[in-house]
């Protein structure tokens, strides 16, 4: 599901850039920025800027000042503090894993929720907001089910990517027939061995 969501997000970013507008892409924690950065850099190159608190103050000031000019990044990927960066023409705000409590700034002041701040920021620019999650927060669920937010559910694989095969296993029945020797079914163990055993050319 996450891979589908990432592909959907990438398409929305491309669409926004074609309109000549900027994108703010928020992640709940710095640890996630590395893997997302690698993927986005391959597609968007130098149009992508990274911003978070692990950067030295001088580097963050440089990014801030660059965003005030025509040479500012088209895409900013960052954590909650990125909502305070200046933008010329913001067109899309993405809050990935919007349910995460790390979007809340508790200490030091100012105390704020980056997801909520991002929604307000988007409205100030007339930009779209995309909240991504497999497990919506109570507030987002309420807003989506009452029609305040639009709701897109990925029930099928995005762009016809093949679904994995799901095989139900009756554990109770296996216990009854005394075919369970541990925590895992014989079928699961069989597949584990199949995919972890070295191939003949690796031996």
Residue ranges with predicted function:
Residues 22-38:
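Conserved Walker A/P-loop ATP-binding site and its immediately adjacent core
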Residues 35-56:
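Conserved helix-turn-beta segment of the N-terminal RecA-like "Helicase ATP-binding" lobe
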Residues 1-5, 195-203:
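Single conserved hydrophobic/aromatic residue that forms the stacking wall/gate
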Residues 30, 50-61, 79-82:
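Conserved helicase motor
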Residues 10-19:
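Walker A/P-loop NTP-binding motif
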């Amino acid at each position: 599901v996450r891979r589908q969501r990432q592909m959907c997000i990438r398409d929305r970013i491309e669409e926004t850039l074609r309109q000549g507008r900027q994108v703010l892409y928020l992640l709940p924690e710095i640890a996630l920025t590395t893997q997302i950065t690698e993927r986005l850099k391959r597609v968007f190159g130098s149009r992508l800027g990274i911003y978070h608190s692990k950067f030295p103050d001088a580097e963050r000031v440089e990014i801030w000042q660059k965003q005030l000019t025509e040479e500012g990044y088209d895409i900013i990927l960052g954590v909650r503090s990125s909502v305070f960066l200046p933008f010329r023409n913001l067109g899309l705000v993405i809050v990935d894993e919007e349910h995460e409590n790390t979007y809340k700034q508790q200490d030091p002041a100012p105390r704020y929720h980056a997801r909520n701040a991002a929604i307000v920021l988007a409205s100030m620019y007339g930009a779209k907001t995309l909240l991504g999650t497999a497990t919506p927060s109570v507030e987002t669920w309420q807003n989506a089910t009452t029609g305040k937010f639009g709701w897109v559910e990925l029930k099928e694989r995005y762009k016809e990517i093949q679904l994995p095969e799901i095989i139900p296993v009756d554990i109770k029945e296996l216990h009854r027939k005394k075919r369970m020797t541990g925590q895992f079914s014989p079928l699961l163990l069989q597949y584990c061995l199949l995919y972890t055993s070295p191939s003949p050319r690796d031996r």
